[in-house]
């Protein structure tokens, strides 16, 4: 029932609808604000879908929707510019995607979040939160720490092996 979290979710669903509408028709929200429970976090989840226009293809749709609004915010281009200005390091794989493009044109991808990245003998993992004008700094930090909870637990378990 947090007004900030609800407003953030509404913004993200609207952004997804807008992104899909570039190359799809019949864009709709299949389900809205379902709660999904994980070991360290609870997420509001909505699914937005559409039917690809005849003159569009999976690759164009991917390009037009990437990065996901959940990692960029809105307005997407300006939010990404601000992220680039403020964040001290390039995000690397975080917020990118992993997946495949089939020879038949099929495309399946997932956003890289809550993932370990091993680089030059160092292990990296990242999390973020939706920071807006009415955000509570402490709550946003707590959200990031909660999101990293499962990865942190995995490190502690691995240290005992």
Short names for language-model regions:
Residues 1-161:
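Extended alpha-helical targeting/anchoring segments
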């Amino acid at each position: 029932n947090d007004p900030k979290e609800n407003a953030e979710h509404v913004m993200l669903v609207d952004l997804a609808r807008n992104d899909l509408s570039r190359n799809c028709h019949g864009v709709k929200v299949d389900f809205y604000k379902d709660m999904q429970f994980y070991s360290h976090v609870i997420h509001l989840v909505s699914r937005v879908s559409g039917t690809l226009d005849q003159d569009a293809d999976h690759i164009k749709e991917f390009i037009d929707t990437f990065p996901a609004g959940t990692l960029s915010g809105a307005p997407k281009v300006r939010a990404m510019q601000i992220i680039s200005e403020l964040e001290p390091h390039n995000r690397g794989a975080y917020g990118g995607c992993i997946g495949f493009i089939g020879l038949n044109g099929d495309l399946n991808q997932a956003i890289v979040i809550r993932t370990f990245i091993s680089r030059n003998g160092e292990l990296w993992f990242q999390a973020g939160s939706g920071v807006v004008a009415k955000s509570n700094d402490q709550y946003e930090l707590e959200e990031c720490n909660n999101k990293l909870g499962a990865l942190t637990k995995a490190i502690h378990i691995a240290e005992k092996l």
